[in-house]
């Protein structure tokens, strides 16, 4: 009888010890997961502009709010490779983020081109307001979910302009010109309506193509022209203001899904905070870089009547291209509604 009681007590002791050990192991594993450092490599094609500024602010916020559990690394000026390679890297988890205009992701989902629709955004202030629209954010952030991309931020960059080797002072000067555009049907169709020949090209190839005379110019952001010293090859910028340029931050869903829930919340929250801070910064930067360009080249505006004529010519481009695909048309309608709500 005593032996049986001893055996029972011994088993109970072992069971208790096992539970204690299991609990200690679980707590230790949880602490280990909490203490793990996650590297977040962010790539962008530009440098010293709003996209680069967003990266710096975002990384500073995330490192602080995560207590150092996320370590950010920023690679501007295509240091991680050409734009298509950076996007692929994000999809497969080789890098953690790409920052740039959504039109570069049309190969991932053609709806990313919807923000290229001309004539919907009136000015910088309107562009900033529309980026805060919840319905537009929800759509744009979710377009890449099935393709390994998690959208986290959107902000207004600036209106488009044409940088060219020869001055574009009138609408007729655009006709026959070979101009670089993003790989978006809406941008290409817009230039065709103006009589130009659109050529899709990644950013790293644009300046050499202008220098070599392979193209006459490009539809670009003035701040990119100025910070990358395009004035050494093409001294004329014409502010057409269409289409408006937006930037987005795209993270690797493969990487994001491995993060603990609290870090996911920090990233999503800080991404939006950084975008809100960068919006006014981008507006000021646009004005500053316009003055920088004037020191090296010329900034041209079309005559008011011709600017109005151009807007009229481009007005239906978005709706026409959107009709080619039901899901693109649905996305276009979301953008139109957001633009109207924030006008």
Task: Enumerate the language-model features and the residues they cover.
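Short, low-complexity disordered leader/linker segments with a strong preference
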Residues: 1-39, 342-343
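N-terminal secretory/targeting leader peptides
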Residues: 31-127, 135-343
